[in-house]
Swiss-Prot record:
Keywords: Aminoacyl-tRNA synthetase, ATP-binding, Cytoplasm, Ligase, Nucleotide-binding, Protein biosynthesis. NCBIfam families: hisS. The lineage of its organism: Bacteria, Pseudomonadati, Pseudomonadota, Gammaproteobacteria, Pseudomonadales. It comes from the Bacteria. GO terms for molecular function: ATP binding; histidine-tRNA ligase activity. GO terms for biological process: histidyl-tRNA aminoacylation. Homodimer. SUPFAM superfamilies: Class II aaRS ABD-related, Class II aaRS and biotin synthetases. PANTHER family: HISTIDINE--TRNA LIGASE, MITOCHONDRIAL-RELATED, HISTIDYL-TRNA SYNTHETASE. It is an enzyme of class 6 (ligase). This is Histidine--tRNA ligase. It comes from Ectopseudomonas mendocina (strain ymp) (Pseudomonas mendocina). CDD domains: HisRS-like_core (cd00773), HisRS_anticodon (cd00859).
Length: 428
């Protein structure tokens, strides 16, 4: 007996009963991004491996352990994208979108891929919405991105469920000086570090700061902090970000251990975290990457952005019961018809209603059946009303309009008055 085919572990189907929540989240965010002047860009999910090795950084967990990399038929190394910023920067460079200092505000959405241990809120194929801004070096756009995310949380009802953590990584020179000081401190306490942190001490020591190991965290209590090594320009930039967040009324926590897992960040970094999802608490994260464009072969170009995880945000909305109840309603109106002539008339009426009321979700019964069986399907669809068309209604050129969600009486409505009647019902 052949083995039944299944999805790859950690790569999940998003089923019809789940997609309304995804569409609700994505449409809410896209509406916000439009309002802030960000334009959509669509990017490949496969890039040359070199892009991520140069952009994300050798020695990072993402590049060393987590990428899906393979050789194509030309023996070229390709990788399923593990994140979106590097690919977006590549597109901006390739098409000259930021040439001559022109400002670009872009967003993209789609699947990312990392070989990680699958668990709730962490998958091998996961979906992100990413937002990037180029040629804006000041603290104002850093703050704008954070304010934008804050507005999204308020729209979704999540404002009390998330906390903003904020830090500045300073310039590359300041970060290098801090790196040396941190390494010197930790080398003296090498035996007290967990095995993973011992390895990172030579490959990516800043990542030790967000170790989840309790013994390592105890060692870090007395470690030097990034704030002690900030250059003056970065300090003023960070003060500018904080001043704007204060003016917008957005609360934040300074987290000197917040470094982010990708090498390209400098100056502002931030994360929105929640305590409602256990270990997978980061729902949105980003920061400034002023050196990345040059690192990938372009002219020095300021950049800043963020990405948010769709799966985690949907999970958070579900956990807190914040999804609108009507999301699971397949239709507003279910059209029932019995008899061949009635079915033909129902088709004509339904299509006319689609023209006259384009926002109305109409589900025309398929597969025949008695009125009793059709009413069961109408109820299951979540529709608020059933339209009934049989021989009697056909003869009188009327339609029975039956409320399904309250005790109101069924009404007979003339065909020509049906659109007006349903529009009024929707407003009620």
């Amino acid at each position: 007996m052949s083995k039944s085919l299944q999805a790859i572990r950690g790569m999940n189907d998003i089923l019809p009963e789940q997609t309304p929540a995804w569409r609700y989240l994505e449409s809410t965010l896209v509406s916000l991004l439009d309002g802030y002047g960000y334009k959509e860009i669509r990017l490949p999910i496969v890039e040359y491996t070199e892009l991520f090795a140069r952009g994300i950084g050798e020695g990072t967990d993402v590049v060393d352990k987590e990428m899906y990399t393979f050789l194509d038929r030309n023996e070229e190394s390709l990788t399923l994208r593990p994140e979106g910023t590097a690919g977006c920067v590549r597109a901006v460079l390739e098409h000259g979108l930021a040439g001559g200092g022109q400002v670009q505000k872009l967003w993209y959405a789609g699947p990312m891929f990392r070989y990680e241990k699958p668990q709730k809120g962490r998958y091998r194929q996961f979906h992100q919405v990413g937002v990037e801004a180029f040629n804006l070096p000041g603290p104002d756009v850093d703050a704008e991105l954070i304010v934008l995310t804050w507005r999204l949380w308020k729209k979704l009802g999540l404002a009390d469920a998330v906390t903003l953590q904020l830090n500045s990584l300073g310039s590359s020179e300041a970060r290098a000086a801090y790196r040396d000081a941190l390494v010197a401190y930790l080398q003296e306490r090498f035996d007290q570090l967990d095995e993973d942190s011992q390895r990172r001490l030579t490959t990516n020591p800043l990542r030790i700061l967000d170790s989840k190991n309790e013994a390592t965290q105890a060692v870090l209590v007395g470690a030097p902090t990034l704030g002690d090594y900030l250059d003056e320009e970065s300090r003023l930039h960070f003060e500018g970000v904080k001043a704007r967040l204060d003016a917008a009324g957005i609360r934040y926590q300074i987290n000197h251990k917040l470094v982010r897992g990708l090498d390209y960040y400098n100056r502002t970094v931030f994360e929105w975290v929640t305590d409602k999802l256990g270990a997978q608490g980061t729902v949105c994260a980003g920061g400034r990457y002023d050196g990345l464009v040059a690192q990938l072969g372009g002219k020095a170009t300021p950049g800043v952005g963020f990405a948010m995880g769709v799966e985690r945000l949907v999970l958070l909305l579900e956990t807190l019961d914040l999804l609108p109840a009507e999301l699971n309603r397949a239709a507003d109106v279910y059209v029932c018809a019995f008899g061949e002539a009635a079915e033909l008339a129902a088709l004509t009426l339904t299509e006319r209603l689609r023209d006259e009321l384009p926002g109305l979700r109409l589900l025309l019964n398929s597969g025949g059946g008695s009125f009793k069986s059709q009413f069961k399907k109408a109820d299951k669809s979540g529709a608020r009303y059933a339209l009934i068309l049989g021989d009697d209604e056909l003869a009188g050129r009327v339609v029975g309009c039956k409320p399904l969600r309250d005790d109101s009486e069924q009404q007979s409505v003339a065909w020509d008055a049906l659109a007006e009647h349903l529009a009024a019902c929707q407003q009620a």
